Amino acid sequence: MMDSEAHEKRPPMLTSSNQDLSPHIAGVGDMKHYLCGYCAAFNNVAITYPVQKILFRQQLYGIKTRDAVLQLRKDGFRNLYRGILPPLMQKTTTLALMFGLYEDLSRLLHKHVSSAPEFATRSVAALLAGTTEAILTPFERVQTLLQDHKHHDKFTNTYQAFRALRCHGIAEYYRGMVPILFRNGFGNVLFFGLRGPIKESLPTATTYSAHLVNDFICGGVLGAVLGFLSFPINVVKARIQSQIGGPFLSLPMVFKTIWIERDRKLINLFRGAHLNYHRSLISWGIINATYEFLLKIV
């Protein structure tokens, strides 16, 4: 009953994905996209953090899922959510910027470069939003250190981890920024570019619940595919960011080292990718569905 009443009151928001997006970019001063992105990220991190921790151990050490789970069990329940503050701060801010800047930049580019195709302006907006997110690299950096059990005896919380990096200079906070730029920039272009077409290929939603399911499927499928494609980049990033001090090695050099360590086998490089696929499916399903749902009620 509530679904049908809502449908009668707000018909433009429950038709096609093109119609869904158009009213959301009403003005640069509109902050609801930032707020909805923030809340969607908070919801996602709180639910999926333990799975992310298992995945991280696999990426860093190339171990099997069972061994990663045993490591977490050995660490104890009190350490299960250890390190959640950096990803919570980083993810909420990152997704607020991702969705908010994308909408604002899309509008600005379309307004000032009206001769360019909409696909081009939206792609540039997605790329710029993704690269801007990289300013939050220090949070991802500290998250990596807190999740690595080798550093458990060096610091016990986020503040101590940030403090441990301070003596190495500001550049140490941004170690691993290059793979993050690649991942975020091109990932955003594909995510925002394919989100509309995928949603349009799904059955037309006529109720809030059906709309929520479509948004979950759309975000989940995109997140799973993009997460799988970017998995090797995240493996390299985890290795780079697990180091404190020392020389700053290039992305190709670190990749070569990992490739040799894992017997030059592609399957070993993707160890943990199946878990990442399912985690991304759930995470981005939650993010996209929460974001779109909040847009309708804010």
Swiss-Prot record:
Keyword Transferase carried by entry: no
Intracellular or extracellular location(s): Mitochondrion inner membrane
Bias kind Basic and acidic residues: ranges: 1-11
Membrane topology, from the record: Multi-pass membrane protein
Pfam family, one: Mito_carr
Keywords: Membrane, Mitochondrion, Mitochondrion inner membrane, Repeat, Transmembrane, Transmembrane helix, Transport
Principal cellular location given in the protein's record: mitochondrion
Placement of Solcar repeats on the sequence: 28-108, 117-201, 214-297
Keyword check for Nucleus: no
Region (Disordered): 1-21
Catalyzed reaction equations: NAD(+)(in) = NAD(+)(out)
SUPFAM superfamilies: Mitochondrial carrier
Highest taxon above the source species: Eukaryota
GO cellular component: a single term: mitochondrial inner membrane
GO terms for MF: NAD transmembrane transporter activity; organic anion transmembrane transporter activity
GO biological process: aerobic electron transport chain; mitochondrial NAD transmembrane transport; NADP biosynthetic process
Transmembrane feature ranges: 36-56, 85-105, 119-139, 180-200, 216-236, 269-290
Family, per entry: Belongs to the mitochondrial carrier (TC 2.A.29) family.
Protein's job: Mitochondrial membrane carrier protein that mediates the import of NAD(+) into mitochondria. Mitochondrial NAD(+) is required for glycolysis and mitochondrial respiration. Compared to SLC25A52, SLC25A51-mediated transport is essential for the import of NAD(+) in mitochondria. The transport mechanism, uniport or antiport, its electrogenicity and substrate selectivity, remain to be elucidated.
Name of this chain's protein: Mitochondrial nicotinamide adenine dinucleotide transporter SLC25A51
Organism: Mus musculus
Gene transcribed to yield this protein: Slc25a51
